[in-house]
A protein has these predicted regions:
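N-terminal accessory beta-strand-rich subdomains and adjacent acidic, glycine-rich linkers
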Residues: 21-233
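Bacterial Sec-dependent N-terminal signal peptides
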Residues: 1-21
Length: 233
């Protein structure tokens, strides 16, 4: 049996009231994630000292209200680091996959949590709820702010019944019309020629995320949430 090397470092910090900036670096310290908690929760991703993009107003709209709530109060921040080898059940390209990241888990006073992981190759986040009974999610919100001259490559489509065979379009963000949508994966190239790829994982009993064009910026788009809202209204 092959051994698995796991290095975990954990630090728990208690916060009274509202945190302004919570920073997490990638293991190689090249990427920096800065989470801001104020009227809403936002995050900024830096490569070195250059701001790559920002994600504004991260929240779920549920039948229990917004998660996290507006002007959310931070209860605690838990930091950990992982360095291990993952052996996949089904070996495709690799029989062993190195996994190395720094994680920050923010717990709010409404008992909701946001989990952020920063790898050398990218960043991820997800919601963790602690609500009683079934939870109806009306929508998941995130506004992705890039330089308007960034080039977006994705399959533009307008139906939840998409066959995912639409041709890929290549346009500046500023050239995409408001209301247009497209599925993942989606690739963005910044003016400094950094490629940012949008992906999602571990989606179960939940609609897949698309990207849509808002008034100015890209935003998360979920077909099922909008159909439920229309039926209720």
């Amino acid at each position: 049996m092959k051994g698995v090397l796991v290095t975990v470092f954990s630090l728990l910090i208690s916060y009274m009231g509202m945190a302004k900036d919570i920073e997490t670096l990638s293991p190689d310290k090249n990427l920096k994630l800065n989470v801001s908690v104020d009227d809403d929760v936002s995050m900024q991703v830096y490569m070195g000292t250059d701001l790559l993009f920002e994600v504004k107003d991260i929240h779920l709209d549920t039948d229990h209200g917004l998660v996290p709530t507006r002007r959310a109060k931070v209860r605690s921040v838990n930091r950990s680091s992982v360095d291990r080898i993952v052996v996949p059940e089904i070996k495709e390209k690799f029989s062993e996959i190195p996994e190395k990241y720094n994680e920050t888990l923010i717990t709010f006073k409404d008992k909701s949590k946001l989990q952020f992981r920063v790898y050398n190759e990218g960043v991820v986040y997800r919601f963790i709820t602690d609500l009683e009974g079934d939870v109806v999610i009306n929508d998941e919100h995130a506004e992705f702010v890039f330089d308007q001259s960034s080039i977006l490559t994705f399959q533009q489509d307008s139906s939840m019944n998409s066959d995912y065979e639409a041709p890929y379009i290549v346009k500046n963000i500023s050239e995409i019309e408001q209301g247009k949508t497209g599925n993942l994966p989606a690739l963005l190239q910044t003016p400094s020629s950094v490629n940012v790829l949008f992906l999602e994982s571990a989606t179960e009993d939940y609609p897949c995320m698309w990207l849509g064009k808002g008034e100015e910026n890209l935003q998360a788009h979920f077909w099922l949430a909008r159909i439920v809202q229309q039926a209720v209204n």
